[in-house]
C-alpha cells in the first residue's frame, strides 16, 4: 500500500486536533460486512487533550431540541437565508438563535468553521462551589515515611488556588475528622475503626445537623469560583487561603498512631472507615454533585473494620493470585463488596478517590480498585512515601496550564451521539454508566454498555476512553450528505473546570461508509495501533471476570480470524501468507500483549496487576502501545545516539548500552564489555571521551522520557548478569534460548534467555498455519 505513510500522518493529525483514533477509518455499510471485520469499530478518545488552538467560546452552544441535544458543528447543513440548521443525528430542522442573524457564507460563527471539529464552551453557569480536596492520611507508619508524607501534603497546599476548599482526616486504629475552623487548638472528632457509619451518623456525630445547600443562584466572587461552603461545614472544609496556617500546624504536629503494635502483629488500620467517613463528611456538608477529590495516602493494608483485607497477625499473609485462584480468600469478597458499594456511592455524588500507596507490601489496591476506576481517580503504587517516585508523581497531580489553572476537571460526564448508521455498544475506561437509553444504543454490549452517557467524575488531559460501536442496519446513504455517505459521531464532555466554571468540550468526527461488499477501502482504513489498544482494553476488561487462559484463547482466536480475513494467501500454504503494511505490526502487538503483565499475573502481586490495568485504561494510543510493546534503543560506537532495535534477545550485545522504556520502568542496560570498561573507570580517563559520551547519552534520553510521564516510572541502571537485568529479559522476545542451538544462525554474542515461552517467530509460524487453514 503506497500511501500507508500518508494515511498514518493523517490519523496522527486527527489525533492531535481532536484527540481521537479509530480502529477503522472507513465504516462498513452493512451489519454482515461489520461482523467480518473481527476487530470492532472503536474510538480511543482523549476529551481534554491539551491543544492551544482549540477555540474557547464564551457563550452557550446552539443545541438541537430534546431529546437529541446535538450541538451545532461543521457537519450540519445550514440554510443561511432561512436561518435554519439541520441536525445530522435526528434530522430535525432547528431555528438559529436571533443573534446569528448576520451570518453568511463569508462570515460564519466559529463552531461552523470546517477546522472546528473540536471546540470548547465556557458555560455561563458557575459550579456550585470551588473544588474540594479531602486528605485522608494513614498514621500507622514509620516516622521518616510519615514525615515525608506530611511534607509533600504541606507542599501541595501551595499548589492549590487560594479558593480551593480543603479538609483533613487521619486514621490508624481510629478515624479522626479534624475541625480546621477551630483555631484555639487542634480539635478532632473520633470515629471507631471497627464500625461503619452512615451519612446520618457522621452528620450527627460531628454536629452538622440539617443544613441548607448552597443557594443555586449564588454568584462567584472575583477570584473565588462558585458559592462558598455552607456555614456549618466551614468548621471542617475551608478555603486554603483561610486555613493554610491551621492545617499546616495540624499536619506538622501529626504523630504516629499511638496504639501499641506487638512484634508479631500488623498495625490496626481502619482504611475502609476513613474512606466511608470522608464520603459521609462531603454528603453531610451538602457537597453532593460538586467537584471533590478524596486523596487517600495508605502506608499499609486495612486490618480492621469494614474493608479489611488481611488480619492483624503477621503470620497470616495477604492474598496472592494463587490464593484467589484457589478461592482461599478469607476477607477478599467481603472487602470487595464494601469498596464497590462505597465506589457506587462516591461516583453517584460526582466525587473522585485517589489512592497513593507507599508500602513494600500490598495495601489492598485489588479490593479498592473500584474506587479509583469508577471515579477517574489516580492510583499510584510506590515502595514508600520517602521515594522520589511518590513525591514527583504526587506533585504532578497539581500540574497547571498556561493560565495557572489546575490541569484537572471535576464532576465530568460524557455523552455520545451518532448518525443512524452507527450505534454505541459501550465504553471501557474510568467511568460509570448514567443508564441513558436512546435510539443510538446498540443491542450488543462491549464494556460498560446499554447507555450512551457515562459519568467520569475526575478527568485530566491524558484521560482516554475506548468507545465501541456497531453498524445499525443494512446501510443506505445518510439523509444528510450528498455524494459518498458519511457516518458522524459527536462526543459531548461536560465538566467543572478547576477555575470554577462549567465547560463543555465538543468533538465531532465524520468518516466515510464503505461501498458494496468487498470494498478495499475498508482494509486500507485499518489503524493497527489504535486497534491493538482498543482490543487490549477489551482483553483486560474480560480478564477482570474470566479465567486467564480463556482470555488468552480469545486474543488468539480474534487474531487468527483477522489474519484469515485480511491476509493474502493460498489455502493451506503458510509460505504464501502476506499481510498489508497496515496489518503487519498487529500480530506482534498481540504477541507482546499475551506476554504482558496485563494478562499474565505470574511474578506480580494482585495489587500490581490492579495498578497496571488501571494505568492502561487511562492512557492514549501512544502510551498504551509502549506498555504493550516496550521500546528498545541501542547505543554503540558505530552510530551516534540511540538507534531503535528489535525487542529481542538478539539485540543484547556485549559492546552496546540498551535503553528500555516499558512506561512503568525506564531501564539502562550495559552489555558485558561496556560494564567491565565502566567498572574499570575508562570513562574518567583522558582519551576515552567518546566512551564517556556513550554512557551519558542513554541517561539524557531517559531524562527526556521521565520529564512528563505520570506516574513517574521506576528508573533502573543495571549490567549484563545483574539481578535487575530481569526487568529487561522478561520483556524481550526469546529468540535465543537454552533450547536454540548455537549453530542455528544466531549471533554468538546474543543473550541466552532461560524460558519455555514461545518466540515471536514460532508464534507467527503457528498463526500463519492456522490462518491459511481457516481454523479459528
Curated annotation (Swiss-Prot):
Subunit structure, as described in the record: The COPII coat is composed of at least 5 proteins: the SEC23/24 complex, the SEC13/31 complex, and the protein SAR1.
Organism expressing this protein natively: Phaeosphaeria nodorum (strain SN15 / ATCC MYA-4574 / FGSC 10173)
GO cellular component, one term: Golgi membrane
Pfam families: Gelsolin (PF00626), Sec23_BS (PF08033), Sec23_helical (PF04815), Sec23_trunk (PF04811), zf-Sec23_Sec24 (PF04810)
Alphabetical list of InterPro entries matching this protein: ADF-H/Gelsolin-like_dom_sf (IPR029006), Gelsolin-like_dom (IPR007123), Gelsolin-like_dom_sf (IPR036180), Sec23 (IPR037364), Sec23/24_helical_dom (IPR006900), Sec23/24_helical_dom_sf (IPR036175), Sec23/24_trunk_dom (IPR006896), Sec23_24_beta_S (IPR012990)
Cited CDD domains: Sec23-like, Sec23_C
UniProt protein name: Protein transport protein SEC23
Protein family according to the UniProt entry: Belongs to the SEC23/SEC24 family. SEC23 subfamily.
Functional note: Component of the coat protein complex II (COPII) which promotes the formation of transport vesicles from the endoplasmic reticulum (ER). The coat has two main functions, the physical deformation of the endoplasmic reticulum membrane into vesicles and the selection of cargo molecules.
GO biological process: COPII-coated vesicle cargo loading; intracellular protein transport
Gene: SEC23
Keyword tags: Cytoplasm, Cytoplasmic vesicle, Endoplasmic reticulum, ER-Golgi transport, Golgi apparatus, Membrane, Metal-binding, Protein transport, Transport, Zinc
Membrane topology: Peripheral membrane protein
Subcellular localization, as worded in the UniProt entry: Cytoplasm; Cytoplasmic vesicle, COPII-coated vesicle membrane; Endoplasmic reticulum membrane; Golgi apparatus membrane
Recorded GO MF terms: GTPase activator activity; zinc ion binding
Residues reported to bind Zn(2+): 64, 68, 87, 90
Major localization class: cytoplasm
Gene3D superfamilies found in the cross-reference section: beta-sandwich domain of Sec23/24 (2.60.40.1670), Sec23/Sec24 helical domain (1.20.120.730), Severin (3.40.20.10), von Willebrand factor, type A domain (3.40.50.410), Zn-finger domain of Sec23/24 (2.30.30.380)
Amino acid at each position: 500500500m503506497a500511501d500507508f505513510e500518508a494515511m498514518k500522518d493523517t490519523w496522527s493529525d486527527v489525533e492531535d486536533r481532536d484527540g481521537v483514533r479509530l480502529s477503522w477509518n472507513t465504516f462498513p455499510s452493512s451489519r454482515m460486512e461489520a461482523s467480518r471485520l473481527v476487530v470492532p469499530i472503536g474510538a480511543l478518545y482523549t476529551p481534554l487533550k491539551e491543544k492551544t488552538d482549540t477555540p474557547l467560546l464564551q457563550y452557550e452552544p446552539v443545541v438541537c431540541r430534546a431529546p437529541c441535544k446535538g450541538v451545532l458543528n461543521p457537519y450540519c447543513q445550514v440554510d443561511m437565508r432561512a436561518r435554519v440548521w439541520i441536525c445530522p443525528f435526528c434530522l430535525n430542522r432547528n431555528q438559529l438563535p436571533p443573534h446569528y442573524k448576520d451570518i453568511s457564507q463569508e462570515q460564519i460563527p466559529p463552531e461552523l468553521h470546517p477546522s472546528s471539529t473540536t471546540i470548547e464552551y465556557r458555560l455561563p453557569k458557575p459550579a456550585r462551589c470551588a473544588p474540594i480536596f479531602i486528605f485522608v492520611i494513614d498514621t500507622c507508619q514509620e516516622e521518616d515515611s510519615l514525615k515525608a508524607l506530611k511534607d509533600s501534603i504541606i507542599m501541595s497546599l501551595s499548589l492549590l488556588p487560594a479558593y480551593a476548599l480543603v479538609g483533613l482526616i487521619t486514621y490508624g486504629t481510629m478515624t479522626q475528622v479534624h475541625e480546621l475552623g477551630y483555631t484555639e487548638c487542634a480539635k478532632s472528632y473520633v470515629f471507631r475503626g471497627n464500625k461503619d457509619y452512615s451519612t446520618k451518623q457522621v452528620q450527627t456525630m460531628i454536629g452538622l445537623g440539617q443544613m441548607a445547600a448552597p443557594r443555586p443562584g449564588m454568584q462567584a466572587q472575583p477570584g473565588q469560583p462558585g458559592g462558598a461552603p455552607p456555614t456549618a461545614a466551614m468548621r471542617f472544609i475551608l478555603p486554603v487561603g483561610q486555613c493554610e496556617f491551621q492545617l499546616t500546624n495540624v499536619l506538622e504536629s501529626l504523630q504516629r498512631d499511638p496504639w501499641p503494635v506487638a512484634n508479631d502483629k500488623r498495625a490496626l488500620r481502619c482504611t475502609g472507615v476513613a474512606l466511608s467517613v470522608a464520603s459521609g463528611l462531603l454528603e453531610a456538608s451538602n457537597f453532593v454533585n460538586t467537584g471533590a477529590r478524596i486523596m487517600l495516602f495508605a502506608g499499609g493494608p486495612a486490618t480492621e473494620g469494614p474493608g479489611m483485607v488481611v488480619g492483624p497477625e503477621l503470620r497470616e499473609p495477604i492474598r496472592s493470585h494463587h490464593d484467589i485462584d484457589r478461592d482461599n480468600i478469607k476477607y477478599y469478597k467481603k472487602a470487595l463488596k464494601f469498596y464497590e458499594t462505597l465506589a457506587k456511592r462516591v461516583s453517584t455524588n460526582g466525587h473522585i478517590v485517589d489512592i497513593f500507596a507507599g508500602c513494600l507490601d500490598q495495601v489492598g489496591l485489588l479490593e479498592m480498585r473500584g474506587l479509583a476506576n469508577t471515579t477517574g481517580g489516580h492510583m499510584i503504587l510506590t515502595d514508600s512515601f520517602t521515594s522520589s517516585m511518590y513525591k514527583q508523581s504526587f506533585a504532578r497531580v497539581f500540574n497547571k496550564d498556561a493560565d495557572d489553572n489546575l490541569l484537572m476537571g471535576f464532576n465530568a460526564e460524557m455523552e455520545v451521539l451518532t448518525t443512524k448508521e452507527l450505534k454505541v455498544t459501550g465504553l471501557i475506561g474510568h467511568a460509570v454508566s448514567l443508564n441513558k437509553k436512546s435510539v443510538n444504543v446498540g443491542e450488543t454490549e462491549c464494556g460498560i454498555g446499554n447507555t450512551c452517557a457515562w459519568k467520569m467524575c475526575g478527568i485530566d488531559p491524558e484521560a482516554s476512553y475506548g468507545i465501541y460501536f456497531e453498524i445499525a442496519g443494512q446501510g443506505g446513504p445518510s439523509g444528510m450528505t450528498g455524494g459518498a455517505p458519511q457516518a458522524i459521531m459527536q462526543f459531548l464532555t461536560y465538566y467543572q473546570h478547576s477555575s470554577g466554571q462549567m465547560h463543555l468540550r465538543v468533538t465531532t468526527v465524520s468518516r466515510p461508509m464503505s461501498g458494496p461488499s468487498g470494498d478495499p477501502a475498508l482494509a486500507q482504513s485499518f489503524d493497527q495501533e489504535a486497534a491493538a489498544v482498543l482490543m487490549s482494553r477489551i482483553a483486560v476488561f474480560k480478564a477482570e471476570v474470566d479465567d486467564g487462559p480463556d482470555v488468552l484463547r480469545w486474543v488468539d482466536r480474534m487474531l487468527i480470524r483477522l489474519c484469515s480475513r485480511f491476509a493474502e494467501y493460498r489455502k493451506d500454504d503458510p509460505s504464501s501468507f502476506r499481510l498489508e503494511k497496515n496489518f503487519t505490526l498487529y500480530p506482534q502487538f498481540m504477541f507482546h500483549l499475551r506476554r504482558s503483565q496485563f494478562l499474565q499475573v505470574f511474578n506480580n502481586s494482585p495489587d500490581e496487576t490492579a495498578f497496571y490495568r488501571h494505568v492502561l485504561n487511562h492512557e492514549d494510543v501512544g502510551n498504551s502501545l509502549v506498555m504493550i510493546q516496550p521500546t528498545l534503543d541501542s547505543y554503540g560506537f558505530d552510530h551516534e545516539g540511540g538507534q531503535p532495535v528489535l525487542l529481542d534477545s538478539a539485540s543484547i550485545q556485549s559492546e552496546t548500552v540498551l535503553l528500555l522504556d516499558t512506561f512503568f520502568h525506564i531501564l539502562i542496560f550495559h552489555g558485558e564489555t561496556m560494564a567491565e570498561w565502566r567498572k574499570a573507570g575508562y570513562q574518567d580517563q583522558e582519551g576515552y571521551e567518546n566512551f564517556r559520551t556513550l554512557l551519558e547519552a542513554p541517561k539524557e534520553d531517559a531524562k527526556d522520557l521521565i520529564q512528563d510521564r505520570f506516574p513517574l516510572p521506576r528508573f533502573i541502571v543495571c549490567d549484563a548478569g545483574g539481578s535487575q537485568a530481569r526487568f529487561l529479559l522478561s520483556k524481550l522476545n526469546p529468540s535465543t534460548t537454552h533450547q536454540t542451538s548455537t549453530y542455528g544462525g544466531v549471533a554468538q554474542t546474543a543473550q541466552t534467555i532461560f524460558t519455555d515461552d514461545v518466540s515471536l517467530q514460532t508464534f507467527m509460524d503457528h498463526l500463519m498455519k492456522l490462518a491459511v487453514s481457516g481454523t479459528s
